[in-house]
UniProtKB/Swiss-Prot annotation:
PTM characteristics: Activated by phosphorylation on Thr-201 during M phase. Protein levels are down-regulated by proteasomal degradation in anaphase.
Region (Important for interaction with phosphorylated proteins): 532-534
Organismal lineage: Eukaryota, Metazoa, Chordata, Craniata, Vertebrata
Span of the annotated motif D-box that targets the protein for proteasomal degradation in anaphase: 328-331
Modified residues (Phosphothreonine): T201
GO terms under biological process: cell division; mitotic cell cycle; mitotic G2 DNA damage checkpoint signaling; negative regulation of double-strand break repair via homologous recombination; protein localization to chromatin; protein phosphorylation
SMART domains: S_TKc
Modified residues (Phosphoserine): S25, S26, S260, S326, S340
Keyword Nucleus: yes
Family the entry assigns: Belongs to the protein kinase superfamily. Ser/Thr protein kinase family.
Cellular compartments annotated: Nucleus; Cytoplasm, Cytoskeleton, Microtubule organizing center, Centrosome; Cytoplasm, Cytoskeleton, Spindle; Midbody
Protein name: Serine/threonine-protein kinase PLK1
Catalyzed reactions per annotation: L-seryl-[protein] + ATP = O-phospho-L-seryl-[protein] + ADP + H(+); L-threonyl-[protein] + ATP = O-phospho-L-threonyl-[protein] + ADP + H(+)
GO molecular function: ATP binding; protein serine kinase activity; protein serine/threonine kinase activity
Amino acid sequence: MAQVAGKKLTVAPEAGKPPGIPGSSSSVKEIPEILVDPRTRRRYLRGRFLGKGGFAKCYEITDLESREVFAGKIVPKTMLLKPHQKDKMTMEIAIQRSLDHRHVVGFHGFFEDNDFVYVVLELCRRRSLLELHKRRKAVTEPEARYYLKQTILGCQYLHSNRVIHRDLKLGNLFLNDEMEVKIGDFGLATKVEYDGERKKTLCGTPNYIAPEVLGKKGHSFEVDIWSIGCIMYTLLVGKPPFETSCLKETYMRIKKNEYSVPKHINPMATALIQKMLRSEPTSRPTIDDLLNDEFFTTGYIPSRLPTTCLTVPPRFSIAPSTIDQSLRKPLTAINKGQDSPLVEKQSVPAKEEEMQQPESTEPADCYLSEMLQQLTCVNAVKPSERAVIRQEEAEDPASVPIFWVSKWVDYSDKYGLGYQLCDNSVGVLFNDSTRLIMYNDGDSLQYIERNNSESYLNVRSYPAALTKKITLLKYFRNYMSEHLLKAGANITPREGDELARLPFLRTWFRTRSAIILHLSNGTVQINFFQDHTKIILCPLMAAVSYIDEKREFHTYKLSLIQEFGCCKELASRLRYARTMVEKLQSSKSGVAHVKASA
């Protein structure tokens, strides 16, 4: 039997099945609601489904005594019948339980019953850099430094403990509520037993595979440096360096070292990427060299980032005075995809922050074309008419939206539409197509002109011209606070901070049966009047969240709805959504209120 530090993983063959044949999905037992560690007698309540990957399903689990919340990775033993499967799981647990570092996912124990192995891990509520990448594409340079520095510190710790991760990628770099990076998923990790050992085998296919692994020449710590190079490239450029639509072609490019860094990338960043992506492993920098590179030593690294960065770029205060003027350019915030540069208004006090427009990467229609295509595909297969519907298989909690509208009030006959986002910030889209947002601290303000230029101020200091709008904003805020029930807002977002920027309401309209709201980060929300159900569509995650009559919140990948089907109620709302997105698309960009009667 495989052992983990003196403890056996006991896996018995299923009744009526010879050893080594995993059970079919229908024979997999139900995961219990209360998980009991037989050794410590600790009891955990299984809560929200967090996602699945490989053999495992992940749930939020709560220690019933301490009320601490963890992530529970649950693996059916029917998936661990073959010796290599068992050994892989044993190695993963043995490595992870030996680690303890701020930037490595915390290990809090493991146990088993007759049907499952349970691994108790630190909960990272903000998912991973993969979801951030899907929503944001390229991030700002200070953000890239922030995420990379923490990844490097975590990897430095691994290497000092003779552990090679071997699968560093965006999806394995998790984020907690404080937006701190935690390296996770040690399924492909290995321990170096002696100096100079070169590993020859690697089960599975890492995302950012190094050329020496492809060449089966033997590999060591340098594979993690290669992966960090790929991660850095992806964060700054918005796509991986060797990515093609064909795996064979991608591997060919890796072997030939065929990639190019776009000209707009900072030369210091380009130089560091090129060092990490050298074909010869011994020519790459070591993990200890990386943070001494000038990309990190001469560039601004924020001490923390707001959770708003998960979906919109932050705003950066002008960098500390010790930093060279030429390095200040990438530090200002951005509102990508708009026609006009973001400039500081002369009429606004000097406290406001200077804004700058980077290269636009977002489409002018804020991803409505992509959303229309996604809805057309899902509706074409008639997902509610499948012989067998397994809607729960289409669930993807990692795609939960960061922001949605939790309250709204229509005063457009006089002033505009007031709304509250799920983080308790409040905005008004005025009839003159300007927007004003008050952050959840009740003090910070974001003002967006008709041409989409942004200004930042606060309720204590603002130009006289905004007095009426700020008074109206406060009126809307008080009205919604006193009279309206909050929609689906049981997910508690973290306090914003001085770098936060919020998405704003771009366009809206009402029909006889619903209100349609389009946010500047691409999200489209439809609230149905009759039954108070809601759908929230995200084109970047290609996902839909459905808040049903019971106010239960579920998020599904549209491609998985195509595959597994969905209930009639959701299918009819997706059909309606397609018509509404067409209407949004046909309206003029920047028009605050679209006339609609459907």
